[in-house]
UniProtKB/Swiss-Prot annotation:
It comes from Oenococcus oeni (strain ATCC BAA-331 / PSU-1). It catalyses: (2R)-2-phosphoglycerate = phosphoenolpyruvate + H2O. The keyword Lyase applies. It is found in: Cytoplasm; Secreted; Cell surface. The keyword Metal-binding applies. This is Enolase. Mg(2+) binds at D243, E289, D316. Catalyzes the reversible conversion of 2-phosphoglycerate (2-PG) into phosphoenolpyruvate (PEP). It is essential for the degradation of carbohydrates via glycolysis.
Length: 448
């Protein structure tokens, strides 16, 4: 057991070249941990506050020197010499109390989270354990099924695509290493197909391709072709997933969803639900994220009734990793999965609480990156620590995304001690804890 001896934060850059907070924590026995906080582009309005300076003369107003000062000042004073590095809950609750606001608006969730992660890493080092094992204990052995965002749209790119993400999920793989290989092969075949058709193969924020398409269906067609070109079967081996990010398309005044980057079509909520249902019926889609605006709770209940038995309905902007919103969703029957983003809520403790609440309700928890990422690989350890079963961490390019995949392969090797088969489990299609056997069978039999 070792008390916190020092805390130091600095301003560093994320994958978009914007400032973010990095914190370092040392224990009195010399153990060390570092945490770097990611940042989102498509953010839910109820997320914890990402404290920015607002000084337009510096980093276009996106500096984080105020958050850094809060770590080096108030947070350091409250924690140094008072908490053992292993007291994760005590440390997180102390920072929450010090902030004193419901959304961490005083100190900044970016300030608080950097210390929360750094503390956990220092404690893991002190315990002589890898982070996933320190956080989750000896029963942490489920490797996640990846959601690989290989085509980017919406606010994640500059193209004429409305849906924010088009993803592939290697549901038929036997190991995470095989899943990553399948994803990589499909990604490279997708690039060849796009190039052959004269489409741009530059990549977006999350490493996926971001060419223009005629509509939101064409990317799905390309994904099916890419899966087949890689030698796999759509649905059986690799399923599809999409993040609609519908709040970006919704006009609260007209109560309509507009495909503003592509065709310009407008839909009422029931019409938009039917539009999405049509895509699910036509393609081997296993997961749909944020299909409706984050504030339209009754509409979420309806789409869950209609589609929730067939596919995973994920709340991201809808739940913002917040147990208050998740509890309401569970009670109403809205969504059947939650996207877990550390910086949406701001501490590891609250993140674990959200994952546990989801599991108890039969909701799947999907641990996720943000569009503005860093070299920090905490989410790879977190998803294994919690046996969550699914991870969303970008495409098969950009080091900020690949770092997480590499860490997952290291963890799998470590669990199996280099043997082809060991204690690790990759569940593939069975990582959809919220879907019954018939739904899974239907998805894997769907050829697109």
């Amino acid at each position: 057991m070792s008390l916190i001896a020092s805390i130091y934060a600095r301003e560093v850059l994320d994958s978009r070249g914007n400032p973010t907070v990095e914190a370092e924590v040392y224990s009195e026995d010399g153990f060390f941990g570092r945490g770097i906080v990611p940042s989102g582009a498509s953010t839910g309005e109820h997320e914890a506050v990402e404290l920015r300076d607002g000084d337009k003369s510096r980093y276009l107003g996106k500096g984080v020197t105020k958050a850094v000062a809060n770590v080096n000042g108030a947070i350091a004073e409250a924690l140094i010499g008072k908490f053992d590095v292993a007291d994760q809950r005590g440390i997180d609750l102390a920072m929450i109390a010090l902030d004193g606001t419901p959304n961490k608006g005083k100190l900044g969730a970016n300030a608080i989270l950097s210390v929360s992660i750094a503390t956990a890493r220092a404690a893991a080092e002190e315990a002589g354990l890898p982070l996933y094992q320190y956080l989750g204990g000896p029963n942490s052995y489920v490797l996640p099924t990846p959601m690989m965002n290989v085509i980017n749209g919406g606010v994640h790119s500059d193209n004429k695509v409305d849906f924010q993400e088009f993803m592939i999920m290697p549901v038929g793989a036997k190991t995470v290493k095989e899943a990553i290989r399948m994803g990589s092969e499909t990604f490279h075949n997708l690039k060849k197909l796009l190039e052959a058709d004269g489409k741009n193969t530059s990549v977006g924020d999350e490493g996926g391709f971001a060419p223009d398409f005629a509509n939101n269906e064409e990317p799905l067609q390309y994904l099916v072709k890419a899966i087949q070109a890689a030698g796999y079967k759509p649905g059986k081996d690799i399923a599809l997933a999409t993040d609609v990010a519908a709040s970006e398309l919704y006009d609260a005044d007209t109560k309509k969803y507009k495909l503003k980057w592509s065709t310009g079509e407008e839909f009422t909520a029931p019409e938009f639900e039917k539009y999405i249902e049509g895509l699910v019926a036509k393609y081997p889609i296993v997961s749909v994220e944020d299909p409706l605006d984050e504030n339209e709770w009754d509409d979420w209940v309806e789409v869950t009734k209609e589609l929730g038995k067939k596919v995973q309905i994920v709340g991201d902007d809808f739940f913002v990793t917040n147990t208050d919103y998740l509890k309401r969703g569970i009670e109403m029957g809205a969504a059947n999965a939650i996207l877990i983003k550390l910086n949406q809520i701001g501490t590891l403790t609250e993140t674990f609480e959200a994952i546990e609440m989801a599991k108890e309700a039969g909701y799947t928890a999907i641990v996720s990156h943000r569009s503005g990422e860093t070299e920090d690989t905490t989410i790879a350890d977190l998803v294994v620590a919690t046996n969550a079963g699914q991870i969303k961490t970008g495409s098969m390019s950009r080091t900020d995304r690949i770092a997480k995949y590499n860490q997952l392969m290291r963890i799998e090797d470590e669990l199996n001690q280099g043997e082809p088969e060991g204690v690790s489990i990759y569940k593939g299609i069975n990582s959809f804890y919220n879907l019954n056997a018939d739904a899974k069978k239907e998805i894997q039999s769907h050829q697109g």
